[in-house]
């Protein structure tokens, strides 16, 4: 909240309509008198206390004297009355008084718990506690631990003692070729040899045969590369357990082509022992196990593609450098070509080879890994025959093929917008978006309209025969096997610019053989999406006659990463993917020839990189590198998930970031040559590629473009890290560390009990995720159906892992539905999951089952989140969430999900599948809790931040209405000060009517003066004790915890004990809301019960951000007005959050929100101050102030200066939020309302949302320009009627008739504010009649506009459905909706004209009323005052 206006004590301030300012002035004027009275009262009380103390002391002495005298008289009587008789001996005296004292102590101890002096003492203590407020309330239940468990941040230190070191090193080294069964591994071990090298000895030199895999058992080996000028560069240093090998040489050796070292040498740095494994050993194994050979070649091709043709291109900018510029044609293919391929009618000269040839070997690869299911032989043969029959028919009526952005005709038909000919369906029914694909296709420039001409019938037999013979030779098949491929070979003749396959297409992958003409290979610009320019595809290379293309995509089974078009009139022969797989079953050796064709295209640079690359496999919990280790390499995550953890000097560990597939790890530390700043460990089983420092240096020297690419890449990382550090403040975090983004690729779903409807829940979540992008749902039954009943056996582990990796690559998210028991499938789901969702029923028992504990044991480092389901018919809100969380300390986050009735219906599995087969055809509800959960999992959550501003915060109600009408869902809410109160109300109710009602009731309570007067106290810390203020917030929320809210919520307070801001995501709601509203000087800070820290209004450091009411109260602790709120957890004092961050959009972004709407209602400082020179006289200011004939000066007074100093941090944070690219900053028209004018809240609640904004940034009510955060982000469809200015009657939050009457009455009152005051009775009647007519006309126009808006919305839906562009790609962007739905926020021009017309009519009717009598004037005033009073009473 803001204290600028309140602290300015001036007699000219007449706008303070609250008693608070008057009370403050009264205190200042009577301070001396009050202090004197107080000192007198304290003096009297002190004297009474001293007199009471002296009296009792003297009374005790008198009693003691009487006892002594009585004892002496007794002794005298015993001695015969002679005072001079025997005296009272000392020992007898000691015994006597000892017995007396013991007798008294016994009596006192017996009376302590009954009555007497002990009872009085306890009564005094109780009275003192009541006076000094030392009582301690019963503390509510709290979360036991909010920190992650120790295993979550620690690596696994267990070793593999059962395996000998040499066997372990060899096993790890040959894993780059895939998984080998134990018998095959033992056969390979028989061929190993041990080599002992001294320092300086060569392991291999140039011209030595490259036919072995070398594994360092001990010592160190340095690998060098020789340049053309004779100089050498170090590529990498091979240490213990690492290997030296080349995957490309491995394929050469298997293909029968001898390979030699041409530019690479290896020398021992010190005495070393090396294990040598000849590659010929693999040939013997592959003869007996051809299926293993196919698997090994596929693994090699996949890894080469992911690193060489993805990582080096994206991170280093290498394209043309990855392939050879020229390739020698095979004599057999080229010699037989021209005489057979070309005919008199179709022959055309091919273009000259271009020098810009680039990644030819990779043409037709990339994207997601998914292998299509091959068709049966009969269907493929019949399919090919039909296709040949169509081609052999000399029908000239073949349609033209055109290239456009929306619909691209390819060789197989229309890709987008029409049915694709001869395309195979995917493995599963998935809902995918073609938005990215259409963008890539549309970027190819069409030169002329292409046509596909039929092959003349007279040449068809010879052309087909020659094509079969050429493809047979390319595949390495003998002549007698020509009949195997003959049914699958197809021939096409194309005009220029015909697209064979598009980038990202996985259905039309083929092996293409060029017979005549030339094919052009293109690839999308990797920087186009980032720099928003140069979006045309890059020309990679040309494919000439006798060359084959598409082998890499065929071997990897992934989608094509390139677009292939005919450059001129061309004729091609091709075999489809399913046919190749069928041929591969009969002749497995064709994979070697396809792989060899890929390898022959690669440049020497790729081979050198292949020697330097290392492939690393990490099990869950293993460390990639540790903090303070030397950094000599960087890593590329190929699969899995990594976590970066920093260890502080005190031993505390903190998460810095997480890395997923495709991320680069440790590059900044390697380039800067500094030690590792964090420890990086594997969250789950992961695969990485290691790029050493020497390789980077060699590439930088040869290709300077790499330096430019690295600078651009590191600049973006540095900018992102700077925005993160401003809020997190982690000084030791590396620059390239990613924040812990909540974007997962694999999700495991685990039921707590058997009665949890896990299958319907998975279907509902799948339905919501389909609106964001391609998603896949996997169960144990589906896995067995696709891969066989024995797929979960140990022998099939690699096959299952590879298949799951392909599914994960093809989809943005994969759902793993676990079984209800600890089956092998459940264990596999735990190993594959990035996050585990533990699903339970919210109204059932919270006890932890045995199965759930086993799940935690299997995935120690995997993040786990709790999902509690509630029926839609449930009348109560979530409760007892703390019991669920305390029983599961391993849970890091929880979600409350409201479910429809069909989820809890007891049905068989077959009926459930049948039900959701129909449900999946409908559009998901983007406002449902399932959609909110889907956006959270994919990293597309939408956050709403409500800033502080005192009574101006009532405008948040109007903003909530506007957001609701615009169809924008709210996934997370954060607030400060009054924003904490409004945000907590929305998260608790999620109904604008209830929120408005409770907010009005709270505002009415704040305007009751007699309650506030009773709360006044001696202003040492604050003006008010805060007891009544606590009561109003407590009555609003009750004993609700933040954990029980439907929507994730946080509030921000200022901790004056630790001098920082605090973010509250759990605990007592009302307390932290109260603390966030503790404005300094008015309320005492709230004492945090956790640690005893004092918390103030969070707006002092960041003005846009247990039991629920406590933290709400803490967030509203206005310093000086209300006392700081003491946190019941640690005792820290909490104040209003506006002192640190009044609009905590940055905090919301760090909590996982991708798109944020920030609403600022704080006051604006006057920056137009008077320049008074080098010194300032207070007498001169007093003269300027009192002299009405001098020009006024603007000089801040002492309270104003102190207030501005308190808000320095807040202003800086606000500017950063305005300039951020993830936030949409909005400021309504609320400057005319004062910070503490709670009496104006009802008027603010009644404002139309469209009346709160203006397009001028300088004016109050500003909306920042919408920025496009992601061009591929899905824009949800706005609900029908959402684009209309008028409120739909079906969406009215209150009673529609009464609400419209009140709105119309307010508009009429505004129109008549400037009219003359004197009116006759006839004029008053005419004005009322005109009001009714204007109201009727306005309602008619409103209905007409609603109908027109509905018709326009329906028409737009039809157009979108026809174009097929309603599917999304990644998520939802509120900025786009705000940009397109401006009419929902800004004032409608027609409504302005209506109000202006009504105002003019009223002005004309009342004109000439100046001669009316004073009696009529009084009657008119009375009528207007009655009307206003009735309206206010209703509000």
Curated annotation (Swiss-Prot):
Q: Motif GXGXXG residues?
A: 948-953
Q: Provide the GO MF annotations for this entry.
A: lysophospholipase activity; protein kinase A catalytic subunit binding
Q: Which reaction does it catalyse?
A: a 1-acyl-sn-glycero-3-phosphocholine + H2O = sn-glycerol 3-phosphocholine + a fatty acid + H(+)
PROSITE patterns per the record? CNMP_BINDING_3, PNPLA, UPF0028
Q: Where is the composition biased (Polar residues)?
A: 435-449, 1311-1322, 1425-1435
The source's domain of life comes to: Eukaryota
Any idea what this protein is called?
A: Neuropathy target esterase sws
Q: Whose protein is this, by species?
A: Drosophila persimilis (Fruit fly)
Q: Which gene encodes it?
A: sws
């Amino acid at each position: 909240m803001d204290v600028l206006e309140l602290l300015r004590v001036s007699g000219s301030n007449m706008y303070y309509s609250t008693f608070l300012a008057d009370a403050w002035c009264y205190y200042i004027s009577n301070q001396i008198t009050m202090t004197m009275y107080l000192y007198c009262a304290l003096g009297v009380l002190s004297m009474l206390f001293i007199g009471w103390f002296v009296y009792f002391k003297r009374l005790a002495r008198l009693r003691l004297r009487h006892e002594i005298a009585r004892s002496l008289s007794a002794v005298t009587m015993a001695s015969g009355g002679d005072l001079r008789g025997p005296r009272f001996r000392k020992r007898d005296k000691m015994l006597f008084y000892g017995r007396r004292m013991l007798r008294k102590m016994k009596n006192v101890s017996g009376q302590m718990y009954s009555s007497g002096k002990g009872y009085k003492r306890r009564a005094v203590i109780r009275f003192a506690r009541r006076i000094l407020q030392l009582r301690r309330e019963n503390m509510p239940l709290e979360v036991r631990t909010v920190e992650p468990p120790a295993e979550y941040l620690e690596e696994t230190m267990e070793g593999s003692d059962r395996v000998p070191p040499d066997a372990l090193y060899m096993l790890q080294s040959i894993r780059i070729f895939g998984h080998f069964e134990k018998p095959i591994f033992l056969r390979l071990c028989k061929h190993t040899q041990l080599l002992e090298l001294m320092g300086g000895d060569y392991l291999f030199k140039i011209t030595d045969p490259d036919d072995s895999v070398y594994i360092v058992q001990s010592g160190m080996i340095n690998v060098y590369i020789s340049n053309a000028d004779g100089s050498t560069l170090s590529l990498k240093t091979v240490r213990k357990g690492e290997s030296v090998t080349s995957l490309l040489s491995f394929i050469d050796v298997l293909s029968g082509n001898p390979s030699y070292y041409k530019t690479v040498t290896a020398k021992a740095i010190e005495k070393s022992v090396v294990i040598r494994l000849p590659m010929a050993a693999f040939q013997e194994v592959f003869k007996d196990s051809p299926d293993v050979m196919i698997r090994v070649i596929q693994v090699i091709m996949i890894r080469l593609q992911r690193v060489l043709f993805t990582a080096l291109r994206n991170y280093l900018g290498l394209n043309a450098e990855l392939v050879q510029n020229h390739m020698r044609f095979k004599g057999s293919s080229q010699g037989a070509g021209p005489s057979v391929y070309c005919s008199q009618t179709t022959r055309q000269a091919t273009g000259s080879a271009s020098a810009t040839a680039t990644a030819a070997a990779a043409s037709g690869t990339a994207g997601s890994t998914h292998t299509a299911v091959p068709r049966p032989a009969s269907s493929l043969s019949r399919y090919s025959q039909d296709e040949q029959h169509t081609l052999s028919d000399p029908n000239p009526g073949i349609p033209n093929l055109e290239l456009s952005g929306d619909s691209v005709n390819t060789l197989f038909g229309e890709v987008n917008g029409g049915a694709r000919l001869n395309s195979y369906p995917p493995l599963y029914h998935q809902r995918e978006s073609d938005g990215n694909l259409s963008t890539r296709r549309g970027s190819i420039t069409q030169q002329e309209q292409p046509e596909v001409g039929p092959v003349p019938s007279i040449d068809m037999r010879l052309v087909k025969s020659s094509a079969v013979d050429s493809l047979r030779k390319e595949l390495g098949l003998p002549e007698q096997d020509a009949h195997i491929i003959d049914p699958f070979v197809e021939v096409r003749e194309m005009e220029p610019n015909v697209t064979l396959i598009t980038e990202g297409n996985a259905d039309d992958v083929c092996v293409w053989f060029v017979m005549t003409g030339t094919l052009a290979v293109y690839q999308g610009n990797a920087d186009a999406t980032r720099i928003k320019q140069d979006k045309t595809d890059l020309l990679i290379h040309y494919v000439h006659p006798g060359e084959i293309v598409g082998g890499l995509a065929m071997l990897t089974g992934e989608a094509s990463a390139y677009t292939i078009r005919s450059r001129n009139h061309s004729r091609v022969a091709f075999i489809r993917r399913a046919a190749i797989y069928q041929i591969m079953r009969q002749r497995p050796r064709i994979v070697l020839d396809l792989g060899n064709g890929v390898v022959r295209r690669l440049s020497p640079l790729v081979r050198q990189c292949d020697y330097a690359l290392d492939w690393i496999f990490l099990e869950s919990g293993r460390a990639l590198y540790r903090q303070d280790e030397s950094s000599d390499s960087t890593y590329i995550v190929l699969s899995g998930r990594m976590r970066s953890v920093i260890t502080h000097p005190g031993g505390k560990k903190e998460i810095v970031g997480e890395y997923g597939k495709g991320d680069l790890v440790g590059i900044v530390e390697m380039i800067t040559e500094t030690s590792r700043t964090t420890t990086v460990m594997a969250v789950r089983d992961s695969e990485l590629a290691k790029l050493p420092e020497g390789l980077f240096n060699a590439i930088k020297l040869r290709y300077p473009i790499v330096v430019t690419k690295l600078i651009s890449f590191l600049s973006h990382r540095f900018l992102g890290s700077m925005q993160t550090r401003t809020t997190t403040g982690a000084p030791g975090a590396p620059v390239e560390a990613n924040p812990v983004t909540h974007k997962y690729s694999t999700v495991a779903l685990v039921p707590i009990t058997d009665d949890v409807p896990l299958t319907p829940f998975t279907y509902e979540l799948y339905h919501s995720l389909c609106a964001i992008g391609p998603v896949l749902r996997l169960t144990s039954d589906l896995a067995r159906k696709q891969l066989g009943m024995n797929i979960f056996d140990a022998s099939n582990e690699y096959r299952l892992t590879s298949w799951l990796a392909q599914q994960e690559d093809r989809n943005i998210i994969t759902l793993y539905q676990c079984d209800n028991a600890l089956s092998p499938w459940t264990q596999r789901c735990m190993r594959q999951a990035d996050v585990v969702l533990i699903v339970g029923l919210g109204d059932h028992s919270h006890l932890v089952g045995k199965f759930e504990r086993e799940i935690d044991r299997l995935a120690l480092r995997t993040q786990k989140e709790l999902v509690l389901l509630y029926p839609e018919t449930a009348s109560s809100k979530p409760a007892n969430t703390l019991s669920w969380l305390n029983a599961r300390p391993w849970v890091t986050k929880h979600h409350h999900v409201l479910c429809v009735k069909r989820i809890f219906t007891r049905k068989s599995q077959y009926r459930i599948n049948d039900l959701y087969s129909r449900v999946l055809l409908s559009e998901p509800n983007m406002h449902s809790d399932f959609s909110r959960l889907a956006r959270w999992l994919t990293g597309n959550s939408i956050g709403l931040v409500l800033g502080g501003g005192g009574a101006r915060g009532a405008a948040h109600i109007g903003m909530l209405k506007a957001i609701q009408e615009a169809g924008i869902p709210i996934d997370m809410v954060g607030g400060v000060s009054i924003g904490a109160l409004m945000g907590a109300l929305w998260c608790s109710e999620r109904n604008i009517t209830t929120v408005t009602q409770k907010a009005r009731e709270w505002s009415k309570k704040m305007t009751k003066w007699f309650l506030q007067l009773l709360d006044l106290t001696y202003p040492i810390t604050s003006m008010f004790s805060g007891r009544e203020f606590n009561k109003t917030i407590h009555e609003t929320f009750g004993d609700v915890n933040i954990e029980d809210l439907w929507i994730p919520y946080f509030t921000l307070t200022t901790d004056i004990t630790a001098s920082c801001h605090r973010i509250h995501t759990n605990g007592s709601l009302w307390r932290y809301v109260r603390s966030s509203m503790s404005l300094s000087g008015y309320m005492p800070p709230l004492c945090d019960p956790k640690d005893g820290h004092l918390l103030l209004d969070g707006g002092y450091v960041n003005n846009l951000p247990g039991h629920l009411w406590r933290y709400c109260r803490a967030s509203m602790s206005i310093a000086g007005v209300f006392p700081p709120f003491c946190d019941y957890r640690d005792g820290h004092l909490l104040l209003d959050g506006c002192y640190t961050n009044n609009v905590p959009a940055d905090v919301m972004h760090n909590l996982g929100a991708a798109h944020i709407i920030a609403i600022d209602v704080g006051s604006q400082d006057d920056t137009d101050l008077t320049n008074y020179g080098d010194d300032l006289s207070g007498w001169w200011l007093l003269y300027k102030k009192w002299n009405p004939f001098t020009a006024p000066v603007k000089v801040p007074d002492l309270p104003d200066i102190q207030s501005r100093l308190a808000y320095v941090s807040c202003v800086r944070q606000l500017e950063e939020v305005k300039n951020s690219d993830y936030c949409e900053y909005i400021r309504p028209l609320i400057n005319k309302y004062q910070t503490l004018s709670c009496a104006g809240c009802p008027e603010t609640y009644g404002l139309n949302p469209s009346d709160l904004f203006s397009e001028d940034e300088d004016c109050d009510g500003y909306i920042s320009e919408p920025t496009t955060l992601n061009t591929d982000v899905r824009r949800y469809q706005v609900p029908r009627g959402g684009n209309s200015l008028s409120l739909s009657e079906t969406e009215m939050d209150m009673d529609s008739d009464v609400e419209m009457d009140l709105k119309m009455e307010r508009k009429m009152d505004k129109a008549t504010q400037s009219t003359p005051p004197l009116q006759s009775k006839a004029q008053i009647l005419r004005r009322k009649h005109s009001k009714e007519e204007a109201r009727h006309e306005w309602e008619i126009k409103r209905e007409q506009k609603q109908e027109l808006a509905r018709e326009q919305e329906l028409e737009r839906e039809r157009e979108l459905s026809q174009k097929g562009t309603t599917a999304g790609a990644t998520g939802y962007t509120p900025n786009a909706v705000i940009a397109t739905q401006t009419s929902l926020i800004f004032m409608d021009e027609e409504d302005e004209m209506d109000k202006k017309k009504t105002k003019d009519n009223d002005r004309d009717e009342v004109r000439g009323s100046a001669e009316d009598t004073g009696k009529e004037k009084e009657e008119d005033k009375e009528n207007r005052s009655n009307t206003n009073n009735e309206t206010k009473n209703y509000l």
